[in-house]
Amino acid sequence: MPWSPLAALSWALVLRLLALLWPPGRGEACSCAPAHPQQHVCHSALVIRAKISSEKVVPASEDPADTQKMIRYEIKQIKMFKGFEKAKDIQYVYTPFDSSLCGVKLETNSQKQYLLTGQILSDGKVFIHLCNYIEPWEDLSLVQRESLNHHYHQNCGCQITTCYAVPCTISAPDECLWTDWLLERKLYGYQAQHYVCMKHVDGICSWYRGHLHLRKEYVDIVQP
């Protein structure tokens, strides 16, 4: 299931929609709903590891009256984790030019590799923005790297609920509580880096790190 209706639109329409969501006068900030890395993988049409070769500012559409711009990143795809049925070798990814429209700034012509998650638009172009999970590969934990191959997308039937304050509880057996913000005051803390929400044969979901069950302090959060 795609992250949003953006996947069904052309890239020019996506940019116009973002412009409506963040009009001039609202400020320069890009606002995104919190999502665990597992949710990002599940909700993205494409997940790849890549290096950025170059960038170029291009028009958002062929309409001469359209003044919107996009950044086209030329990439070298290293590995694809998701999206095999929709794309093969990705050469370019596109993002809004303005950071206020959630445009992504990536390093070009360096040895840095990135994990890129994004959507494949109706015209076949790959669209990324700041609300996707985009991280330098070297910053990912071993558990995150391994989970990209199997565990994340094999457990998309689990729901991850962000916990902001105690008490917080689950409302269904297929939910996992994400407590990084509560315990560490940051989203991508220890739990996001080292745990996967996995479904048991009985349909119950819970956090696992490899073969180890969730540490007790995370479980205790649900108690009033």
UniProtKB/Swiss-Prot annotation:
Keyword set for this entry?
Answer: Disulfide bond, Metal-binding, Metalloenzyme inhibitor, Metalloprotease inhibitor, Protease inhibitor, Secreted, Signal, Zinc
According to UniProt, residues marked as the site described as Involved in metalloproteinase-binding are K69
Q: Which GO terms describe its biological process?
A: negative regulation of membrane protein ectodomain proteolysis; Notch signaling pathway; ovulation cycle; response to cytokine; response to hormone; response to lipopolysaccharide; response to peptide hormone; response to xenobiotic stimulus
InterPro entries membership: Netrin_domain, TIMP, TIMP-like_OB-fold, TIMP_C, TIMP_CS
Q: Where is the signal peptide?
A: 1-29
Please name the PROSITE patterns in this protein's record: NTR (PS50189), TIMP (PS00288)
Give positions of region: Involved in metalloproteinase-binding.
30-33, 99-100
Listed GO MF terms: metalloendopeptidase inhibitor activity; zinc ion binding
Q: Which CDD domains match?
A: NTR_TIMP
The domain of life is Eukaryota
The answer, when asked if Secreted is one of the entry's keywords, is yes
The answer to keyword Transport applying to this record is: no
Q: At which positions is Zn(2+) bound?
A: C30
Organ and tissue specificity: Expressed in retina, smooth muscle, skin, pancreas, skeletal muscle, heart, brain, lung, kidney and testis. Not found in cartilage, spleen and liver.
Q: Which GO terms describe its cellular component?
A: extracellular matrix; extracellular space; sarcomere
Where is this gene product found? Secreted
Q: What does this protein do?
A: Complexes with metalloproteinases (such as collagenases) and irreversibly inactivates them by binding to their catalytic zinc cofactor.
Sequence similarity: Belongs to the protease inhibitor I35 (TIMP) family.
Q: What is the protein's given name?
A: Metalloproteinase inhibitor 4
Query: What organism does the UniProt record list as the source?
Result: Rattus norvegicus (Rat)
